[in-house]
């Protein structure tokens, strides 16, 4: 018997956001690879897992991604990403930024911050990267409404336990090297599955 449904959202599409320091490497592809590994680890622990991208070519809308969690009464929605900085003073400064951060839904779920912290701690430790903390973001004129579409739509369709993990910066040489390595992605999958196994 399933312990509950987890929805994994591999962010972007196959060729979304090229790694600037590596040839033929894209955030959307690496997100999908990590999601597939995490799916296997969660299923081994008794969870049922649904993917917003069932093939690497898929690129559903933000609403479709969040709606999948609500429609299936998911216990947890996890959107898998890596990060890139905004404007920087120099190329060196741009590539120097690194670290993990987790955004959690503003929906009325008291354990969201606790789960976000556990997920972020696992990523920071596994990647040996900077801890950029756990965060929320709302619209400036609409406090309490999630800024990020997948969190907003997952809450609107009935899944308040929702997170975005920014697994380091694919613009940083150390983080990018980790995220482009299949063995390292497997280590991340195990670490994140262990957290979900404990909190649900």
Task: Show which residues each predicted segment covers.
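Active-site-adjacent substrate-binding region
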Residues: 112-142
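Long, well-ordered alpha-helical scaffolding segments within enzyme catalytic domains
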Residues: 33-37, 43, 114-126, 177-200
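Short, well-ordered coil/turn elements that cap or connect secondary structure elements
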Residues: 44, 97, 129, 157-159
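Hydrophobic anchor at the start of a short beta-strand
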Residues: 48-50, 131-132, 162
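Catalytic-core regions of hydrolytic enzymes
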Residues: 2-114
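Short alpha-helical interface elements
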Residues: 63-67, 74, 108, 127, ...
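Active-site-adjacent mobile loop/cap segments within catalytic or ligand-binding domains
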Residues: 4-7, 18, 72, 79-87, ...
């Amino acid at each position: 018997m399933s312990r509950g449904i987890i929805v994994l959202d591999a962010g972007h599409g196959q060729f979304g956001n090229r790694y600037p320091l590596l040839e033929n490497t894209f955030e959307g592809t690496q997100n999908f690879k990590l999601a597939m590994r995490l799916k296997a680890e969660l299923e081994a622990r008794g969870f049922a897992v649904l993917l917003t991208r069932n093939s690497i070519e898929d690129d559903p809308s933000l609403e479709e991604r969040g709606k999948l969690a609500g429609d299936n009464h998911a216990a947890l929605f996890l959107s898998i990403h890596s990060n890139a900085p905004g404007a920087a003073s120099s190329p060196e400064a741009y590539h120097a930024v690194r670290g993990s951060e987790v955004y959690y839904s503003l929906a009325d779920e008291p354990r969201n911050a606790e789960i976000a912290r556990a997920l972020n701690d696992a990523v920071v430790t596994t990647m040996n990267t900077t801890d950029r903390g756990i965060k929320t973001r709302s619209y400036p004129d609409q406090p309490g409404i999630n800024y990020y579409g997948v969190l907003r739509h997952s809450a609107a369709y009935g899944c308040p336990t929702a997170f975005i993990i920014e697994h380091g910066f694919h613009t940083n040489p150390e983080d990018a090297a980790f995220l482009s390595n299949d063995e390292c992605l497997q280590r991340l999958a195990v670490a994140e599955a262990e957290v979900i196994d404990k909190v649900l």
